Structure formats: structure tokens, C-alpha cells
Amino acid sequence: MEDPGLEGQGQAQGQDHAHGRGFGFDPRRDRFDLWFLIVFAVGLALRVLWLDKPEGSLIFDEKYYVNVARIILGLPHDPDVYPDAPPGLDPNHEHPFLAKGLIALSMRILGDNPWGWRTPSVFFGSLSLFLFYLLVKRISGRSDLALLASFILNFDNLFYVHGRIATLDVFMLGFMLLGFYLYASGRHLLSALALALSTLCKLGGLYGFAVIIVYHFLSHFWIAKGGGETGKRIDWPRLFEWLERYTIVYAASGILLLALMDRLWVGYSNPFDHMAFIYEYTKALTREVPEGIESYPWQWLLNEVKIPYLTVNVNVYQDSQLVRTYPSIAFTGAMNPLLIYLALPSVIYAAYSFYEDRRGYTLLAVLWFALTYLPFYPMSILGHRIMYLFYFLNTVPAVALAISHLILDQRPPRIIILAYCIAVLVGYYWMFPFKQVP
């Protein structure tokens, strides 16, 4: 028998749920669900808008992953990328196969074109937003909180850009959110499988697994010690039995699927050899001081070292003289300022709120932030690991949740909430990649 998960724990505390209400999705009865559908539709339309532009250009790391997919499919590819790679096998051994395989599958169906490259990212970006809304609604029992958090996430630039380019990160995030939602729904073993799929897209999915493990133990501890059931003993044998089952499903499914994909599409006969290669490759990615687009993790909280993914400049001439240059397209790896500059204060407030009233969703926000972001600090300080700002993508939803809690917990006038939402839209518009109609 499985433990109740986020949903059951929230009900046990009597704070995060209103007698089971708000768990479903019914736009006909819940106006917040209806408003979310509008936000979702706008987000989807913006991801699809000019998806094939700029023509003939690969954006940022698409140079690698699109060409990897071409190699997997046996198609002609850029000779600068894995020039000696045998066709039919994934030459990009530093990451697991799954996300690259999904890109290749899309290209097999839709063709070697921008729609084939990017449609899976559009799907997973949209899926991530929908799962995030359902997750927040389920763990908090509050549709207004879920709507505001989803609005903030939808109009974050980093989330938007990675939800429409053929890179691995949004696949990892999508499966991670699926794992969180399944856990919150009480389907724990399916949650472990989803988090294994997240890790098989990119190793950062491991942080999502850590979030669930730590949350499960801490929430049981607080329910027993401070959630209205003072004196209740913690059932440690049951907790460790749950940990054993959850970990076995996560590890076994991950290793078995890795072995299958490695044998069919990568060229490894032993998944542990592949895991050893990934470990050695990652360990070697070091530099004493960051260079170029590399950055320290603490710089991400200030949106520093933004990454120019792709810029198309327009030159203006007058009488054969260059008088002005401006970007017509500028894809940038950076967060919406209205999100990132509130990250630290909102997470601190969420931690304070949990200390005060033990709401489960505030604990999740804090752990989500801490376990997907803070591990980069020792990696940077002690290991001199090379890092990039877009590693923060897994943490962006946690910040959106924390900001929404910070705002709504003050019970401000609606005009204040509206003003913040307008400011988020202004920040999104300011960073929107297409500066003019292509």
C-alpha cells in the first residue's frame, strides 16, 4: 500500500486542501481553470509562432542536437559536428539518449526541417505548463495560486525559449513535473518511473528524484511533530520501505531503459560503461575561472552572463555609410527580470511560511529550489565545474510558485496583482526574441 503523497499529507494537515475540492480540471465550473486555458493557449501560440524562423538557422545547442538526430537517422549532417560518427548511432555519449531520440523521431515523421526539430520541445514546454498548473492546484487546493504561478512561468523568457528550441532541457523538466504530479496524485511508483525518464533525458533529472525523497521524509516528520498530530510516532520502517520501493523503481527502470537504448541506438553493450563515461566526461568539465558564456551559479540570481543563443542583426545604410545596426531577432538565455529578482526573497518567505503554518506547498517550493539549484554551489566552489545560466531552468517553476505565494499570502488588492502581471508581460515583451515581424 502506498503512502498518501502530497495530496494525502495536505489533507492530514487540514490546510492545503478543501475537502478534496480543486483536484480536477473543469473550465466549465472553475473560472480559474478557464483563465488557465487562455494562458495556456497564448503560451502555445507564442511557442509555435515563427517556429521556422530564422530560416536555415540552428539556435544555440541545436547545432549539436539536430545534427545528432540527423546522424541517428542516417541523414546528411554538418561535417563540423561529430565528423567521423557512424550513421544510425548516437555519437553524443555525454548525455543519455531519450531526448535526442524523441527529436529524431519527430524528424522522421515531420522531416529534417524546423518543425521536425522543434515540435517535441513545443509539446514538452506546453506539457510542463499544464502539469505545473495541475500540480500546484493539487498540492495547495488553490486555483488562484496555481493560475498566478502558471502565468509567471508561462511568461518567463528562459522557459519560453527552451520550450521552442531543440535542446534537451525542456524534456528533462517535462518528465520531472510529470513525476512530481504523479507523486502528488498518490501514484508513487509511476512517479519514480517518470523521474527516471527525466534523468534519461539529462542527468539533472536526478535532482527531481532528490526533491521527492527529501520532501517525503520531511513532510512525514512535520506531520508527526508539528502538523496537529503532536505525539504521533514516525513510522520509520514504513518510510524506509517506501524509500526502498521508490528507489528500486527509479534505479531499475532507469538502468533497464538506458541499457535498451544504449544497445539499440548508442553502441554500448553495458549501461554501466556509458554511465562511467558520463561521469568521467562531466568530471573533466572544469575551469578555474569561467570564460565567455560560462558563469557562477550565484550570478544566475542576478541574471548575469546572459547567453546570446542567436542574434540576427540588421544594418541600416545611408549614402553607402553604415549608420545603425539593430537586432531583428535575438534569442537570449536569461530569465524574466520580474521572476529572477524576486527568487531569493520569495523562497525565503516560503521557508518562513512553512515554519509558521506547515503548508505542504511552501515546503515543496523551498526544497525544489534548494535541491535543483544549491548543488551547483559546491560543484562550482570545490570542483570548478563549468556551468551555464540555463541550468536554472529546472528551478524556474519553484520560483514561480514561491513568488505567487509571496504575493497572494499578503492578500493585496487585485490592482496590485494585476500590476505585477502587467510588469511580467512587459519583461517578457522586452526579452521576446522577435524584435520585428520576420
Residue ranges, per PLM feature:
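Transmembrane helical bundles and short interhelical boundary loops of multi-pass, membrane-embedded
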Residues: 2-6, 14, 24-27, 214, ...
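Short helix- or helix-capping micro-motifs
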Residues: 43-46, 149-154, 161, 195, ...
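Extracytosolic helix-loop segments that constitute the early lumenal/periplasmic catalytic or substrate-binding loops
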Residues: 48-52, 63-101, 105
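Aromatic-rich transmembrane-lumenal/periplasmic boundary elements in polytopic membrane proteins
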Residues: 53-79, 251-305
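Short acidic/glycine- and proline-prone juxtamembrane loop motifs at membrane-interface regions
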Residues: 59, 121, 158-169
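Transmembrane-helix motifs of polytopic, lipid-linked glycan transferases
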Residues: 115, 119-140, 178, 345-353
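Specific aromatic-rich, kink-prone transmembrane helix
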Residues: 131-134, 152, 171-190, 194, ...
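Membrane-interface transmembrane helices that cradle and orient dolichyl/undecaprenyl
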Residues: 137-140, 177-190, 198, 220-225, ...
